[in-house]
């Protein structure tokens, strides 16, 4: 099926790279999933969000390191031709870079031998109504790659704001299949980066701010046929709960709670969408993700714990069966949508036992670490001592001990709630440095006032029920009045090894490298590199626009590059993007980022750096006009 008209402009060595991968695996496992794992092991590639299934956003490359990072210079750049927020990161496989954009969700394949040359582009025709029901700008978080097999060539997958998932030929850009995953008539859109496991491509859903009931769906990579769909709320059979669901931790809750923790049919419009990042452990065959906030935001309208919104899930990829779910914020009152990054590591716990861990910095201001084989809660630490809605998380029960002063009930206008609805962490993809055993966290340092109100549900319209005022916080601490932080966190000890303040939220995330560097980006348009041991700032560069994507690195022809998608927008940028002035507009974000327009403006693209700016274009003959070429 081909509803688009991609423009093929050349060939690359992508097919050769895949063929080489197959050759390497002839005496080893030969499934496409194993090929993807092997491709991810090569640090020259960046084949998926998070770089590999561990989602550590970590590179073993050391060519760029503490000693020479000051020599980084722009090597080449590419403009997407699209405004609005550019989230996520490009993919690199062999000699190609694949780039996505926010709406209209154009996909580009670029030739790394002649950087920036467009080999093909696939620009869909979408229902423009999708723009009117998008919550917080018309963003998209990335692409997924499947390496192909002896029947089907390699594929690139993208999601579209209008609710479709699309499979494209990675060599030509031709659309292979397209399926409708979400119904924009009820406000359900798609902004998530697809995720490939085995012969499946997984996608979540968006739209909790419009009362959309959340779900994750698995499609056959070759045909687009739906294999399974699992909801976050409702009857157990629709949640795909395994027979032994939460058996190791029955205190988390087990059966029938997707109905019993809601009043009446409120679960049908109860949110729990998942538009964030996934991780996967092939050894236990579980993938991990978070379900988001319940709907509406006004907690008075939905009594109960509202399971299974706000949960960390461990599901079997093949069947979709949930082995465990841990609800972090029962009966969420603050829009602490729990869809943030899941990073996998193997570390010794405090008793010296080696554990397979999952670490998740949540919007509610807590960093959770679980045993990813069974869901055991290992630790739950505050990201910052200003987190005040919760006093502590009890490790034996998993429950938060709340401070009622910062609740959002109808008879109480709560003030100085920390964090704000944006969370102390949001969509940024953070990183884990396995050498130093620390997580590099990008933080939003924003608090809020909250005033709830009642409203009816109307399909396809916003279903929030609260007016928010946000500001850098806490207001009483002038020396910590910046809106962002970068921190190095030890999940075993609970310590922050170092932390640095930023003017604006570190919305885009971090990348750690074996060169002893932590790269990250800022809303006012900087990409920075800090010493991973000390936090000292070693290098920075001002980009053409603010950044809400996250850094990546790759190697081509023996040279390491660092790349970043830039383009301000997303929730923190809606005031700038849509020219809003009311501080409560943009669900409260306009007030928090009122100064952003003093530092950056819109514009989308990719900037690539190398030592001394070296690239294929260091040879001035590369890319020059060749007599006889078509014009």
UniProtKB/Swiss-Prot annotation:
UniProt: Ca(2+) binding residues:
209, 293
Q: May I ask which residue range the UniProt record assigns to the signal sequence?
A: 1-32
Tell me where it mainly resides.
periplasm
The cofactor remark states:
Binds 1 PQQ group per subunit. PQQ is inserted between disulfide Cys-135-Cys-136 and the indole ring of Trp-275. Binds 1 Ca(2+) ion per subunit.
- Localisation per UniProt entry: Periplasm
Q: EC number(s)?
A: 1.1.2.7
Q: Do the record's keywords include Oxidoreductase?
A: yes
Q: Which GO terms describe its molecular function?
A: alcohol dehydrogenase (cytochrome c(L)) activity; calcium ion binding
Query: Mind listing the UniProt keywords for this protein, alphabetically?
Result: Calcium, Disulfide bond, Metal-binding, Methanol utilization, Oxidoreductase, Periplasm, PQQ, Signal
Q: Which domain of life is it from?
A: Bacteria
Q: Record's Gene Ontology CC terms?
A: membrane; outer membrane-bounded periplasmic space
* Names of required cofactors: pyrroloquinoline quinone; Ca(2+)
- List, in alphabetical order, the GO biological process terms annotated in this UniProt record: methanol metabolic process
Catalytic residues as annotated in Swiss-Prot or TrEMBL: 335 (proton acceptor)
| Cystine pairs | 135-136, 418-447
* Catalytic reaction equation(s): 2 Fe(III)-[cytochrome cL] + a primary alcohol = 2 Fe(II)-[cytochrome cL] + an aldehyde + 2 H(+)
Q: How does it assemble?
A: Heterotetramer composed of 2 alpha and 2 beta subunits.
In the UniProt entry for this protein, what further remark is given in the free-text comments? MDH is the major protein in the cell during growth on methanol (in P.denitrificans MDH constitutes up to 15% of the total cell protein).
What the protein does? Catalyzes the oxidation of primary alcohols including methanol.
PANTHER family cross-referenced by the UniProt entry: QUINOPROTEIN ALCOHOL DEHYDROGENASE (CYTOCHROME C) (PTHR32303), QUINOPROTEIN GLUCOSE DEHYDROGENASE (PTHR32303:SF4)
Q: Which family does it belong to?
A: Belongs to the bacterial PQQ dehydrogenase family.
This protein is called: Methanol dehydrogenase [cytochrome c] subunit 1
Q: Which organism is it from?
A: Paracoccus denitrificans
| Gene responsible for this protein | moxF
